[in-house]
Amino acid sequence: SAEDAGRKAHRAAGSYTQALKQLTVGHDEQEFLDMFVLLMRKCYLRDIKEMYAWAERMATWGRERQKAFLDYALRLIRENFVYNFRLPQLNYLSQSEEEFSRNFARFVNEANVMGIAAELTSARRDIAQNVNARMVFFDFALKMIVLLIPPKA
């Protein structure tokens, strides 16, 4: 559609290479979004058993794909933080990402955005250094519970 093409052009930010990439990454990006949404819902519900199952599934992916997912998740956290400013020209979200972000963005704020970004960066570094992926993803999932919904005092 014309709206979808406009979104992809906006996300490419004037880069021809990025525009071409936007046309070819659709399937992986949708699966990354699905896995991100699944994790965030399980974290919100504090469903430890399902979070472990999520980490198990992530561990079956290849290292490069795992790193690509973590890069994607970091971008999505940034976009959700910016989404709270209500300035659409600053956002680079696909339509499906924006639908998710309408409800999720309120959980990403100035109190936790740096912590979430640090955990994603740390997880990516650990994956790159060949640390056990199941441990890395489960540890990340557990930390997200506290970062997204801080314990009540």
Predicted regions, residues:
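Charged, glycine-rich active-site and insertion segments that engage polyanionic ligands
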Residues: 1-72, 76, 80-153
